[in-house]
Amino acid sequence: MKTKKKNLKNVLLDMSCSIMHHGHVRLIKRASKYGRLIISLTLDKDLIKYKKIKPELAFKYRKEILQSIKNVHKVIPGRYILDQKFLNKNKIDIVVQGSDYKNRQFKNKVITFPRTLSISSSKIRKLAAKNTLKKKILKI
């Protein structure tokens, strides 16, 4: 039996997605199985402040990429640090997160998935810088 769209839970996945990779895609696919997937995309200013990186792609381009993925219902601007007020305002039922955020506490149901091994935006950034100097093709 098909689930009625109006009965779907609002599922929030917060992401920086400074460099999109297959770990992000896998997380999006898994998260979307729990309901209507809403991605809270970290603002550029928060990436600079908290992660100490200037994103390779501006917020509007990262948003455009994420909105093109079929499992994504919508993408909303988000802060690096989520709080209960934000979840309530956006009517979130379930929070999905990677294991790197497992210590966060919310009133909502929280589902934590393990990270995809051997991949991260930081790792891609470091490999790209190293390989640019050597003029090699990036292999991950």
For each predicted feature, which ranges?
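Nucleotidyltransferase catalytic core that binds NTPs
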Residues: 1-140
